[in-house]
Amino acid sequence: MKAVLALATLIGSTLASSCSSTALSCSNSANSDTCCSPEYGLVVLNMQWAPGYGPDNAFTLHGLWPDKCSGAYAPSGGCDSNRASSSIASVIKSKDSSLYNSMLTYWPSNQGNNNVFWSHEWSKHGTCVSTYDPDCYDNYEEGEDIVDYFQKAMDLRSQYNVYKAFSSNGITPGGTYTATEMQSAIESYFGAKAKIDCSSGTLSDVALYFYVRGRDTYVITDALSTGSCSGDVEYPTK
């Protein structure tokens, strides 16, 4: 692929902008060019419910994780050590202060250090989103891939509002509900099943699964498992 990209550069082609917008990742018709369809074509949006972190009426982000189509994980050490970074917070703040400020609200670390958290998410997961490889851009600017990755995760969190999915079905913080009720609320609101995880019977995470149409259009699909929640689940207030 890199040889093709090099040739495209020499002849002035705009390869990234010419990608097909119809092929769905993990399908037989998926584009073999990893700039046009992600190499790891099943992507997980994981959101947290952590009392004391983020707005009282919002799930916060844990990460956007590209996986193999089978559900197997991408490499645990990330996919491109040359693009790993330990200073993601400063990169985002300098490139897009609005995104940075939104991440402070909706992507806080529950361990107290946002930069360490974000740098981990980028280095382990962001570098595995092949469509954000610098070679895939027509006129790449340093840090553009980083901003695009985090902006996409933030956009998906906003578009797939789990708090609203629950509240629209009568599930609100401070109550106890069955795991089945929570699953049904997500499925009726988004049209797909979620992975819902608990810690000692208390809601902790909700994960939504996506395929990718073309380079950057995310299409929700059923999660590969229902998660660890079972029976009665506490949904605490923040």
From Swiss-Prot:
Disulphide-bridged cysteine pairs: C19-C36, C26-C69, C35-C136, C79-C128, C198-C229
Active site location: H62, E121, H125
UniProt keyword Manganese, yes or no: no
GO cellular component, one term: extracellular region
Biological process according to GO: RNA catabolic process
Catalyzed reactions: a ribonucleotidyl-ribonucleotide-RNA + H2O = a 3'-end 3'-phospho-ribonucleotide-RNA + a 5'-end dephospho-ribonucleoside-RNA + H(+)
Enzyme Commission numbers on file: 4.6.1.19
Alphabetical UniProt keywords: Disulfide bond, Endonuclease, Hydrolase, Lyase, Nuclease, Signal
Top-level EC class: lyase
CDD domains xref list: RNase_T2_euk
Keyword Nuclease in record: yes
Residues in the signal sequence: 1-16
MF-aspect GO terms: ribonuclease T2 activity; RNA binding
InterPro entries, A to Z: Ribonuclease_T2_eukaryotic, RNase_T2-like, RNase_T2-like_sf, RNase_T2_His_AS_1, RNase_T2_His_AS_2
Pfam families in UniProt: Ribonuclease_T2
Role noted for this protein: This is a base non-specific ribonuclease.
PANTHER family recorded: RIBONUCLEASE T2 (PTHR11240:SF22)
Family affiliation: Belongs to the RNase T2 family.
Protein name: Ribonuclease Rh
Natural source organism: Rhizopus niveus
